[in-house]
């Protein structure tokens, strides 16, 4: 999966990590969208075993951004992080009465993309909420398109009761 971003970014991958992708995703969801320093702090205290390899990959992506691209580590954000399924090693566990149960040792490929986004004080003074509100006000004040044909009033559909009474009155020969 290739991700294109408007901000400068760096990537790191850990392949064939001996942790289930489902358990890795549980940890990954804690750090998505956070700053690298916050993410590493969260993972340092997370009790899950998958937090260690995820923290290693995030640290590697931050080091790649700093050394390869010359980005400031203080502005790095965990933009994209995901765990794909790797190959599964299959083992046999002997059980009673000649049976054998299969053990699946799952692996995962963990990918992290960090972006260098400007800090909040370097951004414009308006909040994103204020920018959205301005955009909606501008859309509301824009002149609406005029339709070429004026709409004709919709005809009222006859109900079953009305149609039955009209049929009966026609059969009687009277007009109601």
Curated annotation (Swiss-Prot):
Pfam families linked: Ribosomal_L22 (PF00237)
Biological-process GO terms, alphabetical: translation
Positions of the UniProt region annotated as Disordered: 113-176
Bias (Basic and acidic residues) ranges: 159-176
Keywords: Ribonucleoprotein, Ribosomal protein, RNA-binding, rRNA-binding
InterPro entries to which the protein is assigned, alphabetical: Ribosomal_uL22, Ribosomal_uL22_bac/chlpt-type, Ribosomal_uL22_bac/org-type, Ribosomal_uL22_CS, Ribosomal_uL22_sf
Gene Ontology MF terms: rRNA binding; structural constituent of ribosome
Any one of the GO CC terms: cytosolic large ribosomal subunit
UniProt biased composition (Low complexity): 136-152
Subunit structure: Part of the 50S ribosomal subunit.
NCBIfam families reported in the protein's UniProt record: rplV_bact
Protein role: This protein binds specifically to 23S rRNA; its binding is stimulated by other ribosomal proteins, e.g. L4, L17, and L20. It is important during the early stages of 50S assembly. It makes multiple contacts with different domains of the 23S rRNA in the assembled 50S subunit and ribosome. The globular domain of the protein is located near the polypeptide exit tunnel on the outside of the subunit, while an extended beta-hairpin is found that lines the wall of the exit tunnel in the center of the 70S ribosome.
Similarity annotation: Belongs to the universal ribosomal protein uL22 family.
Protein name as catalogued: Large ribosomal subunit protein uL22
Annotated source species: Mycobacterium ulcerans (strain Agy99)
Name of the gene: rplV
